[in-house]
Amino acid sequence: MKAVNSRLPIFPLPVFLLPNGITRLRIFEPRYLKLVKIASTEQGFIILLNAKSSSLTEIKWGSWVDIINFDEGEDGVLEIDVQCKSLVEILSIENEKEQLNFGCVKEKSHWSQKVNHIKLSELSSSLEDVFKNNIMLNTLYNEKPTHNASWVVARWLELLPINLAIKNTFINDHSYQDAENFVHAIILND
């Protein structure tokens, strides 16, 4: 693990994103337009999982993302596609005068244990169906390594409409097997 040498901007959102996950964000508030400007010229930014019922200080981790695409929506609003390169532990948060938050972070390991591929084919094929039936999701991912068990389980966790507090239990380094069992039980009704 390495520490990030500078402060990174923090964007609090109810978005759960694991390494290699991609999502599209619509940016319209001036302070977050400034965040995007800073992030695009530096090291990216942190998406801080922020449910409506939580405060910034309750969550001590985030998704460190790079901006991989800029676009303008049909309504003229800036749209950015971001990809998570790593989870990070948030060591401290500072607030600037423009109400932007910045954090000192260090990278956090995620699912480094050996992965079991026994249930992969069923989860992979059902995920491939989701991509085929969702044009926007399908276009976000140029590569879909559905042969990679941790990638498949991570994408399912991001997509499933379950409570963020439950998803939060799967961010720890050794939580892969629990995550796989959870996704398998929901998707395949086991």
Residue spans of the language-model regions?
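N-terminal low-complexity, acidic/polar interaction/targeting segments
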Residues: 1-190
